[in-house]
Structures are given as structure tokens and as C-alpha cells.
């Protein structure tokens, strides 16, 4: 019996963004790069070899893959578990957690004001 290759997460399957290590510019394939006339939908690997960072001029080898911006983490078959939280991206989960903490803080602050 042959072993199956390891499954990839949804973030790994998505077209990854690439960040310039020199200046922090993020190349997002779905947006392309208007400054250098790269059309939207062009993956990073398909960029010309002489393409440079539009902000600082760093070569392509200064870029690292950072994954998709709003891709949910985890595997596709697990997205329906966890009251829908598995479908949230990391940023949305952070907003939910810290937003809830802020509301709780305001609640306790209002109790303090009543006393």
C-alpha cells in the first residue's frame, strides 16, 4: 500500500503573496503591479526575471512567500466544524477575540462607574 502525500492546507493551496525583505512591499498576485505593468492574476513565479520591487528596486530573490492574505487556516474538510470559526482568517479571529475583550472591559468599566 502506498502512502498518500501530505494534504495541503487552504492557505498553502492559495496563490501566495510575496513580501520584499528589504522594504516590506507585498506583491499580491490578484492585484498585480500597476507600476511595472504586471497584470492582475500574474503569479509571482511568472514575473519576468528582471522584475524588481516597485518600491525599493530589490531583485526577485529578496522576496519571501507569505501565503494568502485572507485564506482560512486548516484543511477543507474541517471548515464546517467549530461554529464557523474555522472559516475565519487569522485577522478576523483576532478582531473577534480582541473586540470581545474590549467589550468586556467596557462592561466592567461601566460597573465601576455605577459604584
UniProtKB/Swiss-Prot annotation:
Record key words, sorted: Electron transport, Iron, Metal-binding, Transport
| Annotated binding of Fe cation, by residue | 20, 23, 53, 56
Enumerate the CDD domains for this protein.
rubredoxin (cd00730)
InterPro entries on file: Rubredoxin-like_dom, Rubredoxin_dom, Rubredoxin_ET, Rubredoxin_Fe_BS
Q: List the disulfide bonds.
A: none
Q: Which PANTHER family does the UniProt entry name for this protein?
A: RUBREDOXIN, RUBREDOXIN-1-RELATED
Which family, according to UniProt?
A: Belongs to the rubredoxin family.
Described purpose of this protein according to its UniProt entry: Rubredoxin is a small nonheme, iron protein lacking acid-labile sulfide. Its single Fe, chelated to 4 Cys, functions as an electron acceptor and may also stabilize the conformation of the molecule. Could be involved in hydrogenase-linked redox processes.
Q: What is this protein called?
A: Rubredoxin
Which gene is transcribed and translated to give this protein? rub
